[in-house]
């Protein structure tokens, strides 16, 4: 898989173009400011006079309604939540799409599953930082960047690569490295990573470990340190050095215990469950379930959020994070 860097990309394809960033959350703010600071012509499309409108104004952006931005722009970069995109697209963006324009995303969800179907003659691309928005902005300001992905679903103008690569360069992604993939691959791997490992798997593993120690009579504070707080140390080692060097950096006791016991935690059944989660993503079952949840105003999701907030590990964690001076990071 080829990795592109700054020297591989040029901004030329966007020099005379207007980019409308739709949405001003974490990614919207970071990506729009980075492109603006790279010398590109950026406008921000938002609901008029909302909190994001005022924030974008304060950051020095040319802010307008979504309809005005969609009409004005050559490239429309949609960065509002996945579940809102199709509705906003149909009512506020689609009427202003003309041949030669480019529709851009940072997640392929709505294109891949067919909730947004662009008209003929419109490019469809994706540029996705592989990092939270705050890190996208901070590393750019420090003169570097975060890695990212680019995809081209439809190349109606025969220069979609030039456009999406220029966006990646403007955001600062090519400073760290950019990989070209597909909407299908980006969407399905992103959802799987979130559900099975990064957000779902890891949190359930932490909770199970914490509860095991507490139920055995150990102090909740000790349980938190050993199953949650110290996780960052290990993740940072893996992030920076890989698995092999992580093992080299921990004690022999930790290495031997981890290598000989890990397969009893993540078993063949665990991997089978992961495969089923992946099938649900691939065949659209998860997407259908998520959209049904939206139709009932996220009742189940809200209930799960309340239950998570009531966990003992949350109470203990809040106390220890304050003790460690970490509360400012939350």
Curated annotation (Swiss-Prot):
Signal peptide: none annotated. SUPFAM superfamilies: 6-phosphogluconate dehydrogenase C-terminal domain-like, NAD(P)-binding Rossmann-fold domains. Its EC number is 1.1.1.86. Keywords: Amino-acid biosynthesis, Branched-chain amino acid biosynthesis, Magnesium, Metal-binding, NADP, Oxidoreductase. Mg(2+) 1 binds at residues 190, 194. Disulfide bonds: none annotated. NADP(+) binds at residues 24-27, 47, 52, 82-85, 133. The keyword Lipid metabolism does not apply. One of its GO terms (molecular function) is NADP binding. Pathway: Amino-acid biosynthesis; L-isoleucine biosynthesis; L-isoleucine from 2-oxobutanoate: step 2/4; Amino-acid biosynthesis; L-valine biosynthesis; L-valine from pyruvate: step 2/4. Pfam families: KARI_C, KARI_N. Binds 2 magnesium ions per subunit. This is Ketol-acid reductoisomerase (NADP(+)). The gene is ilvC.
